[in-house]
Structures are given as C-alpha cells and as structure tokens.
C-alpha cells in the first residue's frame, strides 16, 4: 500500500490545484462583469476606466464574430462521429445482435458489460436498429 501513497498524493495535489485555478478563473470572469473594483484607473487623455478583464461588450463582439474554422470544426466533428459509429457497429453490430450475444453463456464478462452499455445507449438511435427503416415505411 505504501508504494501507491506518492501516486495518490500527486493526484490529490493536481486535483486541488485545478480546482483552485478554476475557482480563481471563475471569480476573475465574474468580477469583470460586475462593478469595477478600486484597482481600476482612469487615463489622463480619455478619462475612461482601464480594467484587467474582458468587458461585456468585447465578449458580445467575440460571440457575434464568425469563426474562421467553424466549417472545418463541423466537418471534423462529423468525421469523428462517423468513425465512432462505424467502430461501434463493427464491434457490436445491430442492437438486436448485441442483445442476442448477451444471452450467450460463453461470452466474456467484460465484453458483456460493454454490450449492455451499447444496448442501453443505442436504444433511441435508428442507425443501430435493424427494423428502424421498416417502422418508418410502415408509418408513412
């Protein structure tokens, strides 16, 4: 047990550090949206306040500005979604096939656990159901 103690200590330290940094970041963002603090200064020329954070107008402009890589990001997301679905289909097949393989007494326990997760996840996904197209045609 003593050989795991440094590893656990490092994990706890890194987790605590991330939590502290996230809280500081959240406080900084929240402070930039509220009333300016005492540390704000005025310039001699324009008499406007200089704050350390982003103001709301700048953030709104960033939201409205179209991203250069929006289309590329969408294509990349669609590609990874297709790869994910193909990998799942190659691993488990249709949902009904995965249900049938769950009943097999010779199958691996770990693989059965993955199959159960897949069956639960794919219950509302028409691309993983064999009879989804037939149901659609019958309803039309």
UniProtKB/Swiss-Prot annotation:
The record's subcellular locations are: Secreted; Host nucleus; Host cytoplasm
**Which residues constitute the signal peptide according to the record?**
1-22
- Gene Ontology cellular component terms for the protein in this record: extracellular region; host cell cytoplasm; host cell nucleus
Query: Keywords on this record?
Result: Host cytoplasm, Host nucleus, Secreted, Signal, Virulence
User: Where's the motif RxLR-dEER?
Assistant: 57-76
Let me see what the UniProt entry remarks about domains: The RxLR-dEER motif acts to carry the protein into the host cell cytoplasm through binding to cell surface phosphatidylinositol-3-phosphate.
Q: Which family does it belong to?
A: Belongs to the RxLR effector family.
Primary role? Secreted effector that completely suppresses the host cell death induced by cell death-inducing proteins.
The name under which this protein is listed is: Secreted RxLR effector protein 37
